[in-house]
């Protein structure tokens, strides 16, 4: 099968390529870049070496539609909402790693993103690709909206609690910590090594665009869920997200009950691993892999549940989950091309 | 004035020395170490160079009592509770950077620290050295118990809210992130570079010994305060603590009111700097200095206050605050020897 | 095929497992540990998850000989020289990642390692596994001595120059920079995060045990080679070695000639990639992979050649090259199980 | 005394301010910025807090000449060569941290910097501010050209060997490793955290503009010195330079002789510290301070001397040495305002 990657020279794009190069069902990737067309991919990323035919091409939607069955967008806001409709109309499958199709309500999108997005027609047919919980819809999707990195970590951690209605609906707080690669490859003072190293920063306090994305899914699971508090911190590391999640239990719980619930919820999910009592995952334990590792605690003193959910933001939080969704959409083994162990240390 | 440092070869000790070397009222520091007596300090720490008389001495309480007016303990649990009483009885002033004298209730200490501590007699006379809020008692103290690094960041961030009773008493959550130097200089797998770098870990979930220390002070300010949720994360950096604090407002607040309260609360405190609306401090902005920087947000969607409080764990969280307390105890300018600007970048 | 790993809980061991898990010709790995036998591997390394049968076993050479065709030693000095002879005598193939069998001359070993090693009988039959240059001998080896991390980077960078006798024999200087994982997983002050982070250190000046290993191979290629200067620096990163190599050209050279030589030397080597004129590799460009990337410069002002050679110390510098040697020893495709792309960023 | 800083919002500028704020002889610093005039300095650098009068001003040379006795340039190439002549002509003292006035020969400047610089008139009166070795000239200087960071580390390490003619004149190789802050505060892909972290890069191979600066000084000390090999590596840390220096001894030396020479050479230099036999400095041991620490080795096997010289690139390699030069120019104590101990860890 031929696939195309638009935005191949960003971190999401290069990570898609890392996995797709060894994917058993993908024969060829065409790489597109609006800024670097004409040059060989290895000029930007010498680590990939000499891949045959890896010349970056100018974005040409018509050509893509002729040559490829699936197109991945690993692009900044506003690109996929502009280009994807033509591809959709021509019958191409689209997997969008940007936020353009994630929010069903355009006014919510505009409020949080401060810009316009696609028309309702396309927004409504977009399927939200949180693979573990939306598999049926994903199987039928033509337009797949891949979740944000933070929402992936937060939602996989919250799902069992929210669906089972074990926690107070107005008590959810997510304190998230992310590596720097989540900010993309564009150079800025915020990603300057000397500003990030030996430093922890909070950013976009109460205003991160992933807040409505998380709430939309939580409300789909339990309509009573109230607005959440969600904070994002920049940590001096390249990869990894940890979401530390706090919520008040409706009634007294036991750690055993909680862990049973999580184990059961994810027993068929190859990529979600629940830790033993008293053990919690570190981000490095999923480094470079598609795993989401989860640890759970219950505190009798406060009646609060603490859930710790970690992912590699570029894999399960972006390229890996996108390929997982590709696998589901095509009816392939969900794990195809994704069974790489984390790199440790 | 002559002072002594016990535990001079730990990170707390070497940081005490960095500031005391240039302190206008301190003439000589005697350095004591149980493990390295007889060698010159610069053997362990070449960065200090040739300081005259910096031979590490064997711990001898009698000799100290003869030669020094003030003794600093920068030691592991159990040392100061054993040695300080003799010094106290001989009229020496003691400033203890360990946790031995922080909790007034011995049973609480034993539950969280899993060991015994000093007798009630000494516990009761120990003054808790959160300088900004306990100045009157500190002026009269002979035995000063210097706050823990996390409690310093958390309490300075919480004080105005709790004292003014603006928040629900059962709603406090503190999500804290710390650099590795907080774990001390002892080598262990937990501080191994290859295990810490490119990694975020949560540890001691719901069981950190700083929880009762924070709660003790909060209850002294407002007896209705309920048990808090307090989480600690290890971040791949050497210095710095950020406490991200969440609490539910009792009634609707405005950011303006909140910032006014914080500005007023700390207007006489040289070392606490409150940020402008919409601005939040990063740990690097206090690096190497005795500052605690604070930013505040109020979220109308959730009715929650978010407070971000950052310190250098080895300075305001340890050696710096200890010297600030020394200054207050001796009646000197509170800032003596401490007015070093943060190092940036 | 069944294989065994002795020293499975070190960084070399866990990296062997990462690659062997997906190796097409390896059916089962038995894991041995002298310090942690009886526990499941995932207790030490949660990132690997639930691998069936990954209980760490007590080292039992007889049992290994019965069950396994190949035994890997990823052990500290002195272990393989003690245990390997029995395995060899029983016909088992041994691949040793330690330095025990690398030096042919016992007195040289004793001078640099300050300890004794195996008897001459076994030393002489050991084949040095610098795969790209010793393939014929490796194919016939029963006892394979895997090169050190530094020697791998240095020798692959020097080989074409030395074999073609293009450089003055007394002019070789290798300035090497290594990540911390090269020091192993044992906790020590030298690997403490707070001591390594924001720091560069030189160590073992003129006394590193890899010096005789490099010289032995260089002299095998050109007996006139004189003692080299070789310096090792500890860099605040987990993985990666860069060897910056300096040597005086015997006569004027051109960059074109040099690059032709390198391209030709390695044209059949999948894992050695030579950069274009003016381009030099960074360690991150081989991260997690078995590649050795090389860049070359010639300076007309000084008449010196500069070669920059980078590897991942745990892969091409240890586990990866060991598996590459396994592949050659067994007559399999040299790349089997090793074609993972570097992780970037 | 009033001084001015042009380019106050770069890393050199902010570091000048850190030291000058506490300088006993400096009463007021005026801060100038071409890009951010009109805003308060703390908007760019919240860590400095509320300094009275720290509004960034538009560059106005006439005004500066009226108000200030000394002007520091911490600016990109081309600024000081344009603006300084007016100040010089008006009798203002100028200390230039850029490279504009470092090379006496304009054609050499143009070859290495690929741009034009000041006229011969000003180049010839500029005094090169390697304080330890040029003190007499510095005392009389009106235009002081502050050395580059790499040349400072390299020259302080080489001086005793070159002046005493102990080494072969064509044998000098300097392998330098630098933290990222040396590249300035401008955002670029080369300083992006995700590209720098877990990575070592070599850059400007055989073409760094500091090469002629080092050679010019070496030749002033010994006219027979031949072109040197000088390599620069980017290391994942914020501050610090290590220069590892290799040279062939003319005749057999002893470590004792060498160390005696270094100790004697620097016995009157407060800021150069020579290590004991067998000990070598790490960059962290001078962090945030004006020290240059030096270790020396002699290898009998190769007849080569290895010198390890470390500085904080922003202090002794920039702002600190500039203030040291200010002190000498004004006849003040050379250490005024500079006696801060390194921060460790």
UniProtKB/Swiss-Prot annotation, chains A, B, C, D:
Q: Pathway membership of this protein?
A: Amino-acid biosynthesis; L-arginine biosynthesis; N(2)-acetyl-L-ornithine from L-glutamate: step 3/4
**PROSITE patterns, A to Z:** ARGC
One family from Pfam that matches here is Semialdhyde_dhC_1
Top EC category: oxidoreductase
* Origin: domain of life: Bacteria
User: Coiled coil where?
Assistant: none
Q: What is its main location?
A: cytoplasm
EC identifiers of the protein: 1.2.1.38
Q: Which reactions fall under this protein's catalytic activity?
A: N-acetyl-L-glutamate 5-semialdehyde + phosphate + NADP(+) = N-acetyl-L-glutamyl 5-phosphate + NADPH + H(+)
Task: Tell me the compartments it is located in.
Answer: Cytoplasm
- MF terms per GO, please? N-acetyl-gamma-glutamyl-phosphate reductase activity; NAD binding; NADP+ binding
Query: Could you state one GO cellular component term attached to this entry?
Result: cytoplasm
Active-site residues per Swiss-Prot or TrEMBL entry: 149
Annotated GO biological processes are:
L-arginine biosynthetic process
Q: Keyword annotations for this protein?
A: Amino-acid biosynthesis, Arginine biosynthesis, Cytoplasm, NADP, Oxidoreductase
Q: Which Gene3D superfamilies match?
A: Dihydrodipicolinate Reductase, domain 2, NAD(P)-binding Rossmann-like Domain
Family the entry assigns: Belongs to the NAGSA dehydrogenase family. Type 1 subfamily.
HAMAP family (alphabetical): ArgC_type1 (MF_00150)
What is the role of the protein in this entry?
Catalyzes the NADPH-dependent reduction of N-acetyl-5-glutamyl phosphate to yield N-acetyl-L-glutamate 5-semialdehyde.
Q: What is this protein called?
A: N-acetyl-gamma-glutamyl-phosphate reductase
Organism the protein comes from: Geobacillus sp. (strain WCH70)
């Amino acid at each position: 099968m031929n696939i195309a990657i638009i935005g191949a020279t960003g971190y999401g794009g290069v990570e898609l390529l890392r996995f797709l190069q060894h994917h058993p069902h993908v024969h060829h990737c065409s790489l597109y870049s609006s800024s670097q067309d004409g040059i060989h991919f290895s000029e930007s990323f010498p680590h990939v070496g000499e891949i045959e035919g890896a010349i970056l091409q100018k974005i040409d939607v018509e050509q893509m539609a002729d040559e490829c069955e699936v197109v991945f967008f690993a692009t900044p806001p506003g690109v996929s909402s502009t280009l994807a409709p033509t591809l959709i109309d021509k019958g191409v499958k689209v997997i969008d790693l940007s936020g353009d199709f994630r929010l069903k309500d355009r006014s919510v999108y505009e409020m949080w993103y401060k810009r316009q997005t696609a028309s309702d027609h396309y927004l409504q047919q977009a399927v939200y690709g949180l693979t573990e919980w939306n598999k049926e819809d994903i199987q039928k999707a033509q337009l797949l909206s891949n979740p944000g990195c933070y929402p992936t970590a937060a939602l996989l951690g919250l799902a069992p609690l929210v669906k089972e209605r074990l926690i107070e609906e107005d008590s959810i707080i997510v304190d998230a910590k992310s590596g720097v690669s989540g900010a993309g490859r564009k150079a800025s003072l915020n990603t300057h090594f000397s500003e990030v190293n030996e430093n922890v920063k909070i950013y976009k306090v109460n205003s991160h665009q992933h807040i409505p994305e998380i709430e939309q899914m939580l409300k789909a699971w339990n309509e009573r869920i109230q607005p959440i508090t969600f904070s994002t911190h920049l940590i001096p590391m390249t990869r990894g997200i940890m979401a530390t999640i706090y919520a008040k239990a409706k009634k007294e719980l036991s750690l055993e009950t909680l862990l049973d619930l999580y184990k059961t919820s994810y027993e068929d999910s190859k990529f979600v691993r629940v830790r033993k009592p008293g053990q919690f995952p570190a981000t490095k334990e999923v480094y470079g892999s598609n795993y989401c590792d989860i640890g759970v605690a219950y505190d009798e003193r406060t009646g609060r549940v603490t859930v710790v959910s970690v992912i590699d933001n570029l894999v399960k939080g972006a390229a890996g989950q996108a390929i997982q969704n590709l696998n589901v959409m095509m009816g392939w083994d969900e794990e195809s091309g994704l069974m790489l162990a984390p790199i440790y240390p």
